[in-house]
Amino acid sequence: MNRSNIWNLLFTILIIVTLFWLARFFYVENSPVSKLSYTSFVQMVEDERSVVSEVVIRDDGVLRVYTKDGRVYEVDAPWAVNDSQLIEKLVSKGIKVSGERSGSSSFWINVLGTLIPTILFIVVWLFIMRSLSGRNNQAFTFTKSRATMYKPSGNKRVTFKDVGGAEEAIEELKEVVEFLKDPSKFNRIGARMPKGILLVGPPGTGKTLLARAVAGEANVPFFHISGSDFVELFVGVGAARVRDLFAQAKAHAPCIVFIDEIDAVGRHRGAGLGGGHDEREQTLNQLLVEMDGFDSKEGIIVMAATNRPDILDPALLRPGRFDKKIVVDPPDMLGRKKILEIHTRNKPLAEDVNLEIIAKRTPGFVGADLENLVNEAALLAAREGRDKITMKDFEEAIDRVIAGPARKSKLISPKEKRIIAYHEAGHAVVSTVVPNGEPVHRISIIPRGYKALGYTLHLPEEDKYLVSRNELLDKLTALLGGRAAEEVVFGDVTSGAANDIERATEIARNMVCQLGMSEELGPLAWGKEEQEVFLGKEITRLRNYSEEVASKIDEEVKKIVTNCYERAKEIIRKYRKQLDNIVEILLEKETIEGDELRRILSEEFEKVVE
């Protein structure tokens, strides 16, 4: 039996004993007793219908009289102790007679009867208080900070070697490490370290990992808390937790305080319908005060992470608070390769695994995606009973992460399977032929994920940060290649192109309304995203143009999509023979890799230009 079970058993026993003594004390000691004169007592005894059932004669001259209906009386009659006639009369009436000694023992019994319940009550109360003040109870720690403190040590210590794909951010954070290690170096020349550092970047880019790496490099305590941990139902709790957090930080300085998802508490004040959330605003106000109230020379660095810096309160971002902002971008190809090396260094890899190729095939993946990819590949290898992770495992893992797990058991009729094959082959052919099309890495007609009956995987040759009008038009044409193939080959269209049409329409509308790529409307932006209601979630789109312009926008969007669709059908008709060959191979193999696809298309294909 472990310690907690023993304490629970003792607690139960204490409760039972306490209840027993309390019942005895209140029932016996406080039972209703009435005084009765000796004359009335004699009359009750001599009455033919006597209700007396028992008489207890005590040596102190007190008679305790019990009636048949449960009432109790006391009679003061000192002479009754030696009155033999009274005793004979009681016996003759059939009344039970007994004696009772009243002395020191009775006194101590009364004392113990009072003290024992009191002592037991105190013991139980202390036990309850001890339990409530335990580490996992919130009754007495409701206003305490929920921050978790990590002390870098041993294998759990995270350093910059454990972070990949964020070299610029690491360079910016190295001076923070130097300050935490040797503050006097900066104090001598009057330099002030930023009180707050805001890490900005999409989810999964490693913002929390960077903060822990700074603490690990400087070998200082690391306080981690989420912005949502401050705000509670009761007003004032969040502000109290902020005060407690900074009190703990000052006690462990030098240290790092890291607030994850700070937008949960740091949103613009006064935003929203009906005013702001009083508790959140009080918490934010207290955070602002605390960041003003400590000196950066104390060695406390406040770091925070968010993927929505645009909704943060301006007072939080002014110099003297979060005055240093570091952008953590998604990694490029070299960054992805380094991240893969970090996540695979303790995993057995087969000789055919090429991390550079995997990095090229995962554009847009952030650190969290790549870690999940490596883990998925390891799970696949373990499922197959292999001792090492092969390149095939990584290829399948990429497909599973992008499109979902294969559903090979899903039954599809031969007719629908052929339609799906032409649809996916249409995407591949058009994307290969257009001048700015992304190279096709794989096409498959194996159903995956929730809805996908097939998919075409593109592999960009490099990471791109700008996109031209012609590139967008080529992308639109490739998106509509599947539907174009259905119409050209079967003379009919299916619902399989619904998502392609939705994406194509969205791209075309953005070209017209946001990017100024419409020949008819010119380089103007039409419409404005309305975000003033809740600051952080788009509610509607402000229409700042006339009905005539709205009609022209719709015409331009339709024109762009229609032209790209006609262009896609033209490509399908021109390369119908190659399309049919790809479909036959696809129906046989169900999956065609990019090299084989390009070999089928061969070098004589000319790029189609408008």
Curated annotation (Swiss-Prot):
One of its GO terms (molecular function) is ATP-dependent peptidase activity. Residues 27-107 are periplasmic. InterPro entries: AAA+_ATPase, AAA_lid_3, ATPase_AAA_core, ATPase_AAA_CS, FtsH, P-loop_NTPase, Pept_M41_FtsH_extracell, Peptidase_M41. Its EC number is 3.4.24.-. Its cofactor is Zn(2+). ATP binds at G164, G204, T205, G206, K207, T208, L209, H343, E371. It is found in: Cell inner membrane. In the central section; belongs to the AAA ATPase family. The isolated ADP-bound cytosolic domain forms a 6-fold symmetric protease disk and a 2-fold symmetric AAA ATPase ring. In the absence of nucleotide the AAA ATPase ring also forms symmetric hexamers. This is ATP-dependent zinc metalloprotease FtsH. The gene is ftsH.
